[in-house]
UniProtKB/Swiss-Prot annotation:
GO terms for molecular function: thiosulfate-cyanide sulfurtransferase activity. Transferase that catalyzes the transfer of sulfur from thiosulfate to thiophilic acceptors such as cyanide or dithiols. May function in a CysM-independent thiosulfate assimilation pathway by catalyzing the conversion of thiosulfate to sulfite, which can then be used for L-cysteine biosynthesis. It catalyses: thiosulfate + hydrogen cyanide = thiocyanate + sulfite + 2 H(+); thiosulfate + [thioredoxin]-dithiol = [thioredoxin]-disulfide + hydrogen sulfide + sulfite + 2 H(+). The active site is at C65. It comes from the Bacteria. This is Thiosulfate sulfurtransferase GlpE. It is found in: Cytoplasm. The keyword Nucleus does not apply. Pfam families: Rhodanese.
Amino acid sequence: MDSFQFLSVEQAYQFWVSQSAILVDVRDPQSYRLGHATGAFHLTNDTLNQFLQDADFDVPVMVMCYHGHSSQGAAQYLVNMGFETVYSINGGFEAWLREFPQAITSLQ
């Protein structure tokens, strides 16, 4: 695959429920601590190498940011790193929080 695909928050939730894709959150550490999709891996410059070492490049990856914009750059980066299928979640965490508040974890 040469580029990432877009995924609605509803589609992302279905992948999440079925555990058929990895969910990564690229927001800043404070935002992630305040609340994130349950089970989301916090993907930062500091955690990127570990993520790449541990990842199965054949498993789809869903990238979540604040509103669905900055996730696009991260999604394209993961495609360039060799991931087979990568999605950017439209609406990002704000849409996830609005639609699926029961699927949020806070570290505070």
